[in-house]
Amino acid sequence: MTRAELFAQIQQKSSFLCVGLDPDLDKLPAHLHSEPDPIFSFCQQIIEETADFAVAYKPNTAFFEAHGAKGWETLAKVEALIPKHIFSIADAKRGDIGNTATRYAEAFFTHMNFDSITVAPYMGKDSVTPFLEFEGKWAILLALTSNPGSLDFQLLQDASGKALYQTVLEKSQEWGSPENLMYVVGATRGELIGEVRKQVPEHFFLVPGVGAQGGSLADVARFGMNSSCGLLVNSSRGIIYASKEKDFAKVARREAQKLQEEMRELLDRYLH
């Protein structure tokens, strides 16, 4: 998917919502456990009910990989369910180099046809560029994440006072472009989102941490939006686990619509 196609979806739906698919078997509604593939049934109903409001879906591959070969089959089936005009993200956080990275890219881009994959850039250029060699595909680099442990490394400063995440942003812009490179920027870092935007004015951000983790959607839009929106704000638990009853998918739809309505207002206010 191209940047222009992604922005067209945002404009059409007045939304920059990414629905995270984290199907924890222990948290699924009880009635689904009698299904041949409970995880697939869960994701299928979530996608069907939220597709009107979502511009992206982000399956967390760990929740599929944990079930071995069957889990991989389920992941492939879920990816195939995502409408082709909606951006798909393999949240796999791969981070190896060379031929290994190329094989990861083939797995997610060629065999499962995801539009993008999350990548850990700790090993440097060698761990990122293999993903950028696939036309129409994206690498989404972990830059400034929302978890408490991000303080261990990402905000460490060098002798000049530059934080490690800033070095990641600076160097990685040499490897890709706003057409194939995004960054993970956590919503709980609201005070720093504006600084990240100044450093990478054109790139899209994938923003976790809104809702259950305490991040502010309004702050994300205020400090992070650019002329192409430039934001994919992820919500997982707040949507997919809003109900554990048989109405879970309908409740998920309502929660997705609530976020979309907030996003419509923010797009009207800040898109320029």
PLM ranges: what are they?
Residues 187-234, 238-239:
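A C-terminal functional module that forms or caps the active site or interfaces directly
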Residues 20-26, 62-64, 93-97, 122, ...:
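Active-site beta-loop-alpha junctions enriched in small/polar residues
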